[in-house]
Amino acid sequence: IRDIAELQEDLGNRVMAGFGGVAEYGITVRWDKNFLKILRLLVQRRTPFSMLGGVRFGGTLSIDDAFERGFDHIALAVGAGRPTLIPIPMGLVRGVRAASDFLMGLQLTGAARDDSVANLQVRLPAVVVGGGLTAIDTATEVLAYYPLQVEKFLMRYETLIGERGEETVRAGWDREETAIADEFISHARAIRAERAVAEHEDRPPHIFRLLKKWGGVTIAYRKRLIDSPSYTLNHEEVEKALGEGIEFAECLNPISVLIDEYGHASHLTLNKQRLTRDGHWLTLDDVEKLPARAILIAAGTQPNTVLAREEPDKLGIDDRYFQAFDMDGVPVEPELSKKPGEVHVLANLRDDGRAISFFGDLHPSFAGNVVGAMASARQGYALISEMLQRVEPANRD
């Protein structure tokens, strides 16, 4: 490949071509994801590299199996486990979903592409619960995806009417489906009309004004904006999200989800909170009710430490994360910093010098976001190299 332009695709119609997973849906949309294909090629073109799918580590392949097959080191980079669910009444009704599930469904299925038949429905108004970068990313993605979703629905609806007639197309819908379809159709026609007027007046279409009119997207966070992880980790993302029209409702703690006559989410009720002079958060009696046809929970995740429960004789747990060891096999408590003075990423050391390391959301120093995961790899690769120097290679080829 002589020119990188040969690899670049339009981001709106791009087919996933990196390593998938959180590399696709956990990185801000402001980063050119064409680079994911380039990163994969940079690794995959190297002769010693191989990538095998369909293998569940801890099931298909155990730790002992891996070492018996000649692997000199095992690096665990399996990311987060299950998302944190908020234990509130009606917290799992239709319309409520994990933010990571929405992002994964959007990015990995290509739901936003015109030629995709992926079923990913989101309605407005939408409320995102949480204050991290995932919450920010989810809010901006919902705002960007909604117009594409309803316009695609209208295009296919009109195509089917042309082929089969309106009565036939609508015959199979129940009352709720009819209401949702009419909502999407009216919104799509309003967007289409705005685009036509904008073209006639030679100006950009004001799609955001329409989205705002239909309820828009609000982030609800239990503390202040300046306390949120997204602000402390990357305030620029917050600034850009607010510039795109995202609303931020601070000092609100969810208490229940209200439903409509069909059992679908209609509102989210929240308690107001206040910061006291001694630095504690006090829950007030005041209750706020936010309209919400889509409620996306971005309240963090649990580390994916199931392997420690499956093989407890080889991996230990320290609080919620894997137990870390130094290079002499002594248990240590890692420094809670993305740039620790001394890096501790080893989870197991064998007598022959071979070892297991752990990164990203598995590690207390680096858990929480993709930036931390990348930092863990950068900080830890040198230690892996040093450990490999101690071991006679199982295969010199």
Q: Where do the PLM segments sit?
A:
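A Rossmann-like FAD-binding core segment of flavoenzymes
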Residues: 8-19, 30-59, 69, 74, ...
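Small-residue-rich anion-binding loops in enzyme active sites
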Residues: 53-91
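Redox-cofactor binding/interface segments in oxidoreductases and associated redox assembly factors
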Residues: 74-76, 98, 128, 297
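Glycine-rich dinucleotide-binding loop and its adjacent helix/turn
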Residues: 83-206, 319-342
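FAD-site-proximal beta/loop scaffold in flavoenzymes
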Residues: 94-122, 257-261, 277-365
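Cofactor-binding loop segments of dinucleotide-utilizing enzymes, especially the Rossmann-like FAD-
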Residues: 131, 222-224, 361
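A conserved FAD-binding loop/helix module that cradles the flavin
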Residues: 135, 347, 358-391
